[in-house]
Amino acid sequence: MKLSTIFTVFAATIATVAGYETTGSKQTVDILIDYVIKETPELSQNDVANWENGDTVTLQYVVNNNEETEITVVGVTGQFKNPINNEIVTNLTTGKVGPIAVPPGEAIKFDQKINVDLIPANYELIPHVFIAQDSLIKVIPCRGQLATIVDAAVSFFDPRLIFLELVLLVTFAGLLYVGYEIWGKQYFKSVAPVKAKKTSTKASSPVASASTSAATGYDTNWIPESHLKQKKTKKVN
């Protein structure tokens, strides 16, 4: 069968399979498919993966062809299900693979990247692999993987958070300045203590000088002292 025909059938199969569930009678195939999570290869089927929104999870598949004829891996997809009621929460985007031919008795590996972006909760991930064999496209489900998804913790030094903090700080400072200009100045003026004026002791000098000038009829400050003494002597005689 030509590869172009396989791809045509593969596209038609994806379009007609609702929720990536196979229709019609189930067939038994001797094809073993398993995977490991590259980021946490120690996790098994009985473990619970812990992922954060924004993570990228890489599934590395191993496909063993125990059939008597050659098979071809042409695509991969999957589902996140509710582990309690088994309802489908979301379908993964269908990805094209290869095509990768797998002769009888051999095995191949390939990767699938999954971007985690779900409401924080518990899920079961169930991948599906599309296999072309004998002019047919077969959808083979893989084992499920339980996972707990949470939102990523926001770091205090996150650039987006720092920018938000700066915006809030500038806004708060601006509001304080406007409030001071409108109400603050008037308030501080009204409550500020009034300073008492100090009486200068030098103020008596001009008064005394003026009194002397008025009594003599002229300003005596410029008259030599010897002349004044002579005048006083004459008055006594």
UniProtKB/Swiss-Prot annotation:
Residues 198-219 are annotated as: Disordered. Residues 201-216 have a biased composition (Low complexity). The keyword Signal applies. Residues 1-19 form the signal peptide. Its main location: endoplasmic reticulum. It is a single-pass type I membrane protein. Residues 183-237 are cytoplasmic. Residues 20-161 are extracellular. Keywords: Endoplasmic reticulum, Membrane, Signal, Transmembrane, Transmembrane helix. The chain crosses the membrane at residues 162-182. It comes from the Eukaryota. It is found in: Endoplasmic reticulum membrane. One of its GO terms (cellular component) is endoplasmic reticulum membrane. Pfam families: TRAP_alpha (PF03896). PANTHER family: TRANSLOCON-ASSOCIATED PROTEIN SUBUNIT ALPHA, TRANSLOCON-ASSOCIATED PROTEIN, ALPHA SUBUNIT. Is probably involved in a pathway contributing to genomic integrity. Belongs to the IRC22 family. This is Increased recombination centers protein 22. It comes from Candida dubliniensis (strain CD36 / ATCC MYA-646 / CBS 7987 / NCPF 3949 / NRRL Y-17841). The lineage of its organism: Eukaryota, Fungi, Dikarya, Ascomycota, Saccharomycotina.
